[in-house]
Regions:
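The DNA-contacting recognition helix of HTH DNA-binding domains
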Residues: 21-23
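Beta-hairpin "wing" of winged helix-turn-helix
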Residues: 34-41
Length: 149
C-alpha cells in the first residue's frame, strides 16, 4: 500500500519551516509559492513539495539577503531549470540538437543565479573592507593613546 502524501494547513506549514502563516500567504500573493489547494472546509492545504519550496525560498533569501524582486528572479530560474530537466527526460538520447538547446538554456538560467551571488559577494567584500579599515583606524588611535610620541 502506498502512503498518501502528507498534507497540512498553513499554520502547520509555517511551523515546519520556521515562519508565520502571514509570511506564507505573502509569498503566495507574490507568486513565489505556487497556488494551493483548499480543503472541504476552505482551508489552504499544502504538501511536502510546497514545504520544500518554501524552505528553499527562505534559505536562499536568508543566505543571500535578496530583495523580493531578486528572489523572484532566483526562483524563476530554479523553476525554469526544473522544466528543462523534465524536457530532458522526455527527449530521445540521440537528439543532440534538442539536448544542446536545453543545456544552453540551463546555462543562461545559472548565469542569472550566479550574477545574483556575485553581486552579494561584491557587497560583502566592500563591507569587509570598510570594517577592516575602521578596525585599523581604531587600533591606530589606541596605539597612539597608549604610546604617545
Amino acid at each position: 500500500m502506498i502512503d498518501a502524501p502528507a498534507r497540512f494547513r498553513i499554520g502547520e506549514l509555517a511551523r515546519r519551516v520556521g515562519t508565520t502563516p502571514r509570511a506564507v500567504r505573502y509569498y503566495e500573493e507574490l507568486g513565489l509559492l505556487p497556488g494551493h489547494e483548499r480543503s472541504d472546509g476552505g482551508h489552504r492545504v499544502y504538501d511536502e513539495r510546497d514545504e520544500q519550496r518554501l524552505r528553499d525560498l527562505l534559505h536562499i533569501r536568508t543566505l543571500l539577503g535578496l530583495s523580493l524582486t531578486e528572489l523572484r528572479e532566483w526562483m524563476d530560474a530554479e523553476d525554469a531549470r526544473a522544466r528543462l530537466r523534465e524536457r530532458w527526460q522526455d527527449l530521445p538520447s540521440e537528439d543532440d540538437t534538442a539536448r544542446g538547446e536545453i543545456i544552453r538554456e540551463g546555462l543562461d538560467h545559472l548565469a542569472t543565479q550566479l550574477a545574483l551571488v556575485r553581486t552579494r559577494l561584491s557587497d560583502l567584500e566592500r563591507l569587509e573592507d570598510d570594517l577592516a579599515d575602521k578596525r585599523r583606524r581604531l587600533r591606530s588611535m589606541l596605539a597612539d593613546m597608549e604610546h604617545p610620541a
